[in-house]
Amino acid sequence: MTLKIKFVILLWLFILQNASCQDGDNSVNSSPNIILIFTDDQGYNDVGVFGADDIDTPNLDQMAKDGAKLTSFYSAQAVCSASRAGILTGSYPNRIGIHNAFMPNSKVGLNPSETTLAEMLKDKGYATAIFGKWHLGDAQEFMPTKQGFDEYFGIPYSNDMWPLHPQQGPIFDFGPLPLYENEQVIDTLTDQTNLTTKITERSVDFINRNKDNPFFLYVPHPQPHVPLFVSDKFKGKSKRGLYGDVIMELDWSVGEIINAVEENGLTDDTIIIFTSDNGPWLAYGNHSGSALPFREGKGTAWEGGQREPFLIKYPKEIKGGVTIDAPVMAIDILPSVAEVTNAKLSDAVIDGKSAWSLFTGKSKESPQEAYFFYYRVNELFGVRYGKWKLYFPHRYRTMNGQEPGKDGLPGNYRMVDLKKIELYDLELDASETTNIASKNPDVVVKIQKLANDMRRRLGDSLMNMEGKENRAPGRTE
């Protein structure tokens, strides 16, 4: 073999080895795009693959075929602001001082010292955008552009916080609903008919503009929170009235976003997540969703209040058509994204743990031993532990036995006092009909120990306990 041939062979071996090393580095240091689609007040039973037979959701159904469907995914809390704080920070909302739903001109908001998903990814060079509903404080220092987002188009709080609220006057005194572009009010909304379309168009445009760079796109749709609005192209299309029409348009929006990803050749490099902030607002009757087969809805710790439809698609690592039954909570999304993107977590304590090995099939176990269900101002209502769900005595609201609302007008809740500990086996009794606490004393004791440990850390107003680890929200005062 001549020296020339030997040189050529060695050169090719060097090139191949170097290419292999580079490929390995790229797989380790991958920066997949992240798209988080987050609807408002959508029930578990409002998607075809989760049981809806009167609403067509072809794009979400296809997303389940192409990715994983989680049957035990929980929002961080059963109400707007708190839920959003949890999914964006990886913390229980009460850890960071976020409770309930902020009203307009609130002097409280998400503390800028907390690290959001957007800030975590921005530090890795991601372009970041939010199109939709913010609801984590409408003072300038709390707005999305101060919390890691490069771009913002949408409304600062819920779409019903406007002068056309059905209880305007007797209960509320809302001003005009502002529409923001970054930090500027560009319009006040008197009609929301085309808002879903505009949010979708902005999302598609953002994907097109950032096809050559890693990006994080957060799409917190204001719908199907009341008041319901749908564009003409979907009006009257469903078998479930206006509410079903709205869900069909949201499904269309998901399809448009997925199409934009595909048309830009980004399918294998993009993680797409779909879920909702809490269960349906049952007081609104035919303008609310369905959480069946689960009990109750928004504003409660029962399964219907926080168990949400959840889909995740990432062909590179997540097999299609997979169903995952292990419990996961919204607080686990941020650390999961951190793992897959190799992003650095904040030094501050958070509650979430990565569920990435569960999503990819490398594990069958929940990332956490237990999940804790707080509501109102730091009241611990319940705990999910494996297949078990335990509730502590507390007051909750129900529409059972009440006249439901109709056509945009709410019905009146009835308040119920849960007077003793109740325990349910969710594998056998997902509808939480039969209290079996007395038959499982060892389980009750175990969960009480877990709850007491959490109370020491984050407190429990029902027990007059203050936590040692709570952080303050942001304040303008």
Residue ranges and their predicted role:
Residues 2-4, 19-422, 428-449, 453-456, ...:
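Formylglycine-dependent sulfatase
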Residues 3-11:
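Sec-dependent signal peptide recognition
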